């Protein structure tokens, strides 16, 4: 409801997200925020419908008055003293594709909605925000966006989505003392040279390194069994090769078998005395299914054999199909997020999202709105408390995430990289243990 039309302009800017009270009127809300009724209706397209009725609890985007926006674009830059943010107010910029043209835009609109919901929650806790949003689509002019006077006054900026836009925005943020939060996957190593960048996404190499470290921490006394799944499209060689090197360096023996091996040959790869940890060299579902079938046969022949599995983030997408097997074979699934729809706080936010935006969150893992909510909560709280000293380390964390934990570590001579790593341990008791590193 709120964003379908409002993000079409290059630089929509909102001064507040307002919850309608019992005796509110459209005129009264406009007067309260110093805007015209037309400006309020333009920011909230549903208000332009013939059958529209203002309802208690409804969420309305409150734009800045047009005359204020014009003045901001034409006046001279403020002095450093006047640019200092007001106490308990954080200026937030969002530079992402905010449109309904394609999947990129639709996903980022949901992420942005999560950011707005976080700002609304924080306001109730005494932390105010000014949110400035720019529709930075794939072919947008980065220079035009950065020329907006409001961009310089941001305390932090979420974005961009596209790799080619990172360097100019990163340079701008470094020049103006702004924290740049890159929320999704990008290519390039700007975080290694720009100390104002917070990179949430973990590269394949970093993910493999963290996964190997967690494996060695949990399974030093186990017997690893690598299963070659004959998948020529797999990208998991980065992890399996790194794990085998570590095992060899520490003198830990392991076996390799193949999905095409006969049942007796497959069984020979397993230890009768130690706990066996099965590692596939692909994350795809068909090969996982075939491996589980072989493990079922193995367990039938050797009921007392100890088996665990060390998987991949993709396995969470197959949870509805294989969850019983995850419990049966004690699957350990590495991930950077934990989505639990039954958790009261998560269920509450999803319910409020449905009420505010008249739609459900996209069926994606992780949920984009929850990602935006968690990241906004984490960074806005941190900057409000620590100002320019905020660096996102565990010692400064003041927020318990709904889905997406964050833990940043300084890259040598560069910015901050998210190093948070989680193992989900599916226990035979049909409970899930969350192990956070």
Describe the predicted segments one by one.
Residues 10-437:
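Extracytosolic ligand-binding ectodomains
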Residues 4-6:
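N-terminal signal peptide c-region/cleavage motif recognized by signal peptidases
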């Amino acid at each position: 409801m709120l964003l379908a039309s409002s993000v079409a302009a290059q630089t929509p800017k909102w001064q507040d997200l307002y919850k309608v009270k019992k005796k509110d009127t459209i005129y009264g809300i406009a007067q309260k925020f110093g805007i015209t009724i037309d400006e309020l209706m333009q920011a909230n397209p549903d208000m332009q419908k013939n059958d529209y009725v203002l309802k208690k609890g409804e969420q309305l985007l409150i734009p800045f008055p047009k005359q204020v926006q014009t003045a901001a674009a034409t006046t001279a830059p403020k002095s450093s003293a006047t640019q200092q943010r007001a106490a308990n107010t954080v200026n937030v910029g969002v530079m992402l594709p905010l449109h309904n043209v394609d999947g990129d835009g639709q996903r980022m609109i949901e992420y942005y909605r999560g950011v707005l919901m976080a700002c609304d929650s924080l306001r109730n806790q005494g932390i105010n925000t000014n949110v400035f949003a720019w529709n930075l689509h794939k072919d947008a002019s980065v220079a035009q966006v950065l020329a907006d006077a409001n961009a310089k006054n941001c305390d932090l900026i979420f974005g961009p989505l596209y790799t080619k836009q990172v360097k100019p925005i990163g340079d701008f943020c470094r020049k103006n003392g702004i924290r740049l939060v890159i929320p999704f996957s990008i290519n390039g190593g700007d975080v290694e040279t720009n100390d104002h960048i917070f990179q949430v996404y973990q590269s394949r190499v970093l993910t493999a390194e963290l996964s190997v470290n967690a494996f060695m921490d949990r399974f030093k006394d186990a017997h690893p069994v690598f299963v070659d799944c004959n998948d020529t499209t797999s990208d998991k060689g980065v992890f399996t090769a790194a794990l085998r090197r570590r095992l060899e360096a520490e003198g830990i023996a392991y076996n390799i078998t193949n999905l095409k091996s006969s049942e007796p040959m497959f069984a020979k790869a397993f230890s009768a005395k130690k706990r066996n940890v099965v590692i596939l060299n692909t994350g795809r579902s068909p090969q996982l299914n075939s491996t589980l079938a072989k493990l079922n046969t193995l367990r039938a022949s050797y009921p007392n054999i100890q088996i665990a599995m060390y998987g991949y983030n993709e396995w969470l997408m197959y949870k509805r199909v294989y969850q019983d097997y995850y419990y049966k074979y004690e699957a350990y699934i590495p991930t950077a997020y934990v989505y639990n729809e039954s958790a009261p706080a998560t269920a509450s936010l999803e319910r409020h999202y449905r009420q505010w935006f008249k739609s459900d969150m996209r069926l994606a893992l992780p949920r984009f709105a929850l990602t935006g909510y968690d990241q906004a909560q984490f960074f806005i709280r941190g900057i409000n408390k620590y100002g320019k000293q905020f660096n996102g380390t565990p010692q400064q964390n003041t927020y318990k995430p709904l889905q997406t934990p964050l833990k940043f570590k300084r890259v040598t001579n560069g910015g901050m990289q998210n190093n948070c790593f989680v193992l989900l341990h599916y226990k035979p008791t049909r409970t899930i243990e969350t192990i956070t590193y």
